[in-house]
Amino acid sequence: MWTLKIKVREKWNIYNERTAKYKVKLYFYSQNHYEEKGKLYFIASGINQGEEKQKRNFFLDLKKDKKVVNLEWNNDFFIAVYSEHKTNLRAEAVRIAYNPRLIFLKPVIIDENGWEEWEVASTKREDLEQVNSLRS
């Protein structure tokens, strides 16, 4: 079994800038994705950690984002669906990140500065090399 721990800050991620803005931390699972009418849709769930007012403001701000199709939260737990236009670059990144051979050892942590920490494993080193290539 091969493992990889990386820290990234994705420019297309709708959560990163907001965690930095509201100084909250997300424990995040990207549950699934699908494609429809030239768009990529992402389904995610997670736990929001921080001061109550900041967590609420984070969710209210996120709900205003035009990319967000659905957002529901109860206390700290949330489920979200958001979309973005499909491009070749994003389609390739999605193919790599949603590889069914990847095992997420823990939730992706998006910290108060907007950085994501991923810890993943695979029986094939090449899978992790592809994940690592997403950083560049």
Identify the meaning behind each predicted range.
Residues 2-134:
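DNA-contacting interfaces and partner/effector-binding or oligomerization modules
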